[in-house]
Amino acid sequence: MIEMNAVVAGTELDAARDAGREGASAGWCAWSAGDASLTFSLIVRPDVNMHAFHGLPFVAAMGMMDALVGTASTPGLGLAGKVGIQWSSDIVCGAPAFETSLARVAVNGGAAAAGMFGAVTVDIERSALGELGVDVADEALVETLAAAVLALSLIHI
C-alpha cells in the first residue's frame, strides 16, 4: 500500500529520507506536481544488505515499465512499444529512436534505528506524458507507478 504525502516541489527526496530515518514503512511516498514535471520519492525497505542496493535503480525502472506497459496480470497504461529503459534506469519514449526522456530514476540509500531503506526518486517529464497521450490524474499516476516500483523492489532485490 502506498502512503501518499504531497510536498513542495523540490523537497521530495529530503522528505523521503527524513521519513525513512524516522522509521516510515516501505510504501511511504512524497510527491509533487510542478508545471514541467511530476516527481515522487518512495521509501523501499528490501530485505538485503546495503551492498545489494546497487541494483535498485534498474529494478525501480522495471517496476515503472510494468506500470506503463503492463504485465500478464495487469493492463498498465497501454504504452507497449512506446517506452523503454535507457541503461541503467531512465525511462525514454519516442519510438523508434527512443530519444525523449520520460522519467529519470535515482536511488539514495540510508539507515537508521528502523534499518536500511532506499529512497527511489522518479522525475517524470510532463511534456513526454502529453506526447504519449497519458491522461491520468497526477496523484493516481504517482500511486500507480509507486506501487509497481514497490512491488518489484520487494521481489527482485
Where are these predicted regions, by residue range?
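Beta-hairpin (beta-strand-turn-beta-strand) motif
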Residues: 43-47, 88, 108, 123-125
